[in-house]
Amino acid sequence: MTGVLAGRAAIITGANQGLGLAIAQAYLGAGANLFLCARDGGKLAAAVDSLCACAAPKQTILGEAADVSQPADVARVVAHATDALGTVQILVNNAGIYGPLGRIEDIEWSDWLRAIEINLMGSVLMCRAVLPQFRANRYGKIVQLSGGGATNPLPRISAYAASKAAIVRFAETLAEEARDDHIDVNSIAPGPLNTRLLDEVLAAGPERVGESFYTRAAKQKQEGGAPVERGAALAVFLASAASDGITGKVLSAIWDPWETLPSHWNDLNSDVYTLRRVVPKDRGFPWGDR
């Protein structure tokens, strides 16, 4: 088996459709062995079958229905992946939902909390579960999915935006905690994708998501959006040895020259590609300092 991920084992959450499935396909092509999970067991089984049909001899692809917001499910997935694949080197936290669409005072609070549980808490739980073996092996790759909600406000999609921003800051914090054990933790902004989440926005209509956001979503649907392959390719890079030592960053699959990052090693030891507070002097204003 050849490929930049040959011999490595990866757990990918939310891998039964959309970007998660595209990442699984890219990892398969790069030589990885895969353990996939998602809440919809039927779609997951179909995804596993499609991947197995493309697998090289001796490549392993397994799947298991699980809800990453449930600690027992997370423990089971990591235990079964480790039993089946041996040491796991890669975790991709892709599972996520938009949550309720609408003004914060109008939505169902339980739906808002559910989005936080899946998007943020699920990611944290998965990290907690794999970190002991990553630390024991003094190596690991964690890839988070941030989405546009991490870097820009998303009115009427507040649960998604809040959870994705939290994911990025959690990833940056965990990157510092795990740096000495050679565990890299990074986040991907995949760009505007034409996936299930976009269809949910269009189905909700402008009354719930706002006229401006709905208009942009409809245009994106018509024009095709960003290719999922770019996000998947970045996920391969961040799981490979080529990115060793690059950690605590949020990278745009579409706009950032991530393929060239290894040649900018010294510059990466700064706050580039991170979330930071903007102060007046950053915008050239002559006020704001005491």
Which residues does each PLM region occupy?
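The beta1-alpha1 cofactor-binding region of Rossmann-like NAD(H)/NADP(H)-dependent oxidoreductases
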Residues: G41-G42, A65-V77, W109
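Conserved glycine-rich Rossmann-like NAD(P)H-binding loop of the short-chain dehydrogenase/reductase
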Residues: A30-A47
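Conserved mid-core segment of classical short-chain dehydrogenase/reductases
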Residues: A75, Y98-L113, A136, R156-A159
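Catalytic Tyr-X3-Lys loop
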Residues: E105-V124, Y139, V143, I167
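Conserved glycine-rich cofactor-binding loop
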Residues: A9, N16-Q17
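Active-site helix of classical SDR
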Residues: C127, S163
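Active-site-adjacent segment of SDR/Rossmann-fold oxidoreductases
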Residues: A30, N152, T173-I183, A242-D244
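C-terminal helical subdomain
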Residues: S187, E207-R290
